[in-house]
Amino acid sequence: MMTNTAAYQFVTIRDPQTLAASVLAQAEQHALKGSVLVAEEGINLFLAGAAEQIGAFYTWLQADTRFAQMRIKYSESKHQPFARLKVKIKREIISFRRDDASPLQGRAPSVTPAVLRKWLRNGQDDRGRPLVLLDTRNAQEVRYGTFQGALTLPIDKFTDLPGALEPHRAALADATVVSFCTGGIRCEKAALWMQADGMDNVLQLEGGILGYFEEVGGEGYDGRCFVFDERVALDPELNPLVDADRTA
C-alpha cells in the first residue's frame, strides 16, 4: 500500500539550491517517488511511498521551522503512482507571473470546508450574499469534476486566468467569490491577485478540493478531482480512478 501526499508552503527560501539538494537526498533515502518544486517563494511537494518512510521524511522536513506549519494531505493507493523522483528549482512553485500575487506578503481570507458546505446548503453566505465558486484550474482538470454551478474558465494554464476572468467581473461584483483548486496553492495566488485588482469580496477554499473531500466529503461536488500523477483523478472518498501496477 502506498501513502500519497500533497503539500506546499509559501515561505522565503534564501537557499533554494541547498534545500533542493537536502530534499532530494532525504527522499531518495526513504525510497520516495514524485515531484518537488523549490523556489525562493517556497516549496511544493507531491510524494508517495511506504507510510513509515513518508512519515519519516515529513518529520525531517517539518523539523525545519520554515515548514513546521505545513499542512499535508494524505490518500492511499495500492500501487506507486509516480514513475520517478524529480526535485527541481523554479522561479515560482506555481507559475502565475504576477508580482501583485505573492503569498509571502500575506494571505487572502479563507473559508473552511465545513463553512463552505453550510453556505452551499443555504445557497448564500452568512451575510445573505449569493455565492460564486470560481474554479481556477484548467479545462482538462475541470472535465473530471467540479463544484455544482461553479464558474469555470476555458484556460489551458493558470497564467491565462486573469484574461479569462475579465468578462465576468461585473457578474462577480455583488457576490461572495470562493476561489478553489486542487489543493489550495493556486487559490492562494488567484485570491491575492483578485484583491489587488480591486475585488474585495474574494475568499479561498482552505485546502482546496482535496481538503474539502478529506474533511466533509463530496457534498455539492460533481465527479472527481483530477490529480497530476498516474491515478488520474480521485473521488470524494479519495479513491483513485486508476490504481495499476506499473511494473506488471
Swiss-Prot record:
Where along the chain is the active site annotated? 181 (cysteine persulfide intermediate)
Which Pfam families does this UniProt record tie to the protein? Rhodanese (PF00581), UPF0176_N (PF17773)
Supply the InterPro entries for this chain: Rhodanese-like_dom, Rhodanese-like_dom_sf, TrhO, TRHO_N
* Reactions this protein catalyses: uridine(34) in tRNA + AH2 + O2 = 5-hydroxyuridine(34) in tRNA + A + H2O
Q: Sorted alphabetically, which SMART domains does this protein's record hold?
A: RHOD
Name any Gene Ontology BP term: tRNA modification
- Record flagged with keyword Oxidoreductase: yes
GO molecular function, a single term:
oxidoreductase activity, acting on paired donors, with incorporation or reduction of molecular oxygen
The EC number on file is: 1.14.-.-
Give the record's keywords alphabetically: Oxidoreductase, tRNA processing
Q: Which domain of life is it from?
A: Bacteria
Return the similarity comment. Belongs to the TrhO family.
Role played? Catalyzes oxygen-dependent 5-hydroxyuridine (ho5U) modification at position 34 in tRNAs.
Q: This chain belongs to which protein, by name?
A: tRNA uridine(34) hydroxylase
